[in-house]
Amino acid sequence: MYPEFEVVPAVDMQDGQVVQLVGGERGTEKTYGDPVEAAQRWVDAGARTLHLVDLDGAFEGERQNAAAIDAVLDAVGADVDVQLGGGIRTAEDAVSLLDRGLDRVILGTAAVETPEIVGEISDEHPGSVLVSLDAKDGEVVVSGWTEGTGLDPADAAGRYADLGAGGILFTDVDVEGQLDGVRTDPVRRLVDSVDIPVIASGGVATINDVLALRSAGAAAVVVGSALYEGQFTLDAAIDALGESSE
């Protein structure tokens, strides 16, 4: 998983279309067209991993965009790694997706409500579970970022690492989709708390934000709005990462 730092384009889906939300709030979405076309565009630009999110599933509690997800897997699943979150609530559902060809499942609400699910899935598909720790005001939130849990992200991360999680996906909800830049301190704190990869998400507006997250110790960064709004291109970010590591 993530042998070297990479930029992972987001393909967030709502009603079968690619959208981006501001601050995780329903009603703020901006639509960007067909998921397969978006996925293919990112693969052609050099993506090694795609980050799919079923937003309807995240809000409603069960996956709603199965047809679009299947279409993306059929189109590009053989070319890149694909990870999916949103509405995955049972081990059976997760395993069926992994058996279908998905590389990683992302668990948020399910992992908080039933932590042992992480171990159940990991026993059958080692390294395949990313636990999503989405933080608002320093607290892990679930159910489409609408419910607080009282959990501290760094404290929770250690527990999931012990249960066999392959990585932690950390979304800084307070800056998500706002194109105002990233906050590296929460990422550093998570990286220091676990020995598994931490994938950062939320707030990326420039290539310098990408480089800052790599310096903070993240294994990868998920980018959505900045790519869709043309703040920078994926191939330019990939080039900058290569140049800065030389």
From Swiss-Prot:
Pathway listed: Amino-acid biosynthesis; L-histidine biosynthesis; L-histidine from 5-phospho-alpha-D-ribose 1-diphosphate: step 4/9
GO cellular component: cytoplasm
Keyword Glycosyltransferase (UniProt): no
Subcellular location, record wording: Cytoplasm
One of the GO biological process terms: L-histidine biosynthetic process
Record flagged with keyword Isomerase: yes
Broad class of enzyme this protein falls into: isomerase
Keyword tags: Amino-acid biosynthesis, Cytoplasm, Histidine biosynthesis, Isomerase
Superkingdom of the organism of origin: Archaea
Record Pfam families: His_biosynth (PF00977)
Matching SUPFAM superfamilies: Ribulose-phoshate binding barrel
Enzyme Commission identifier(s): 5.3.1.16
One Gene Ontology molecular-function label: 1-(5-phosphoribosyl)-5-[(5-phosphoribosylamino)methylideneamino]imidazole-4-carboxamide isomerase activity
InterPro entries on file: Aldolase_TIM, His_biosynth, HisA_bact_arch, Isoase_HisA-like, Isoase_HisA-like_bact, RibuloseP-bd_barrel
Catalysed reaction, written as an equation: 1-(5-phospho-beta-D-ribosyl)-5-[(5-phospho-beta-D-ribosylamino)methylideneamino]imidazole-4-carboxamide = 5-[(5-phospho-1-deoxy-D-ribulos-1-ylimino)methylamino]-1-(5-phospho-beta-D-ribosyl)imidazole-4-carboxamide
Family statement: Belongs to the HisA/HisF family.
Protein name: 1-(5-phosphoribosyl)-5-[(5-phosphoribosylamino)methylideneamino] imidazole-4-carboxamide isomerase
Taxonomic placement: Archaea, Methanobacteriati, Methanobacteriota, Stenosarchaea group, Halobacteria
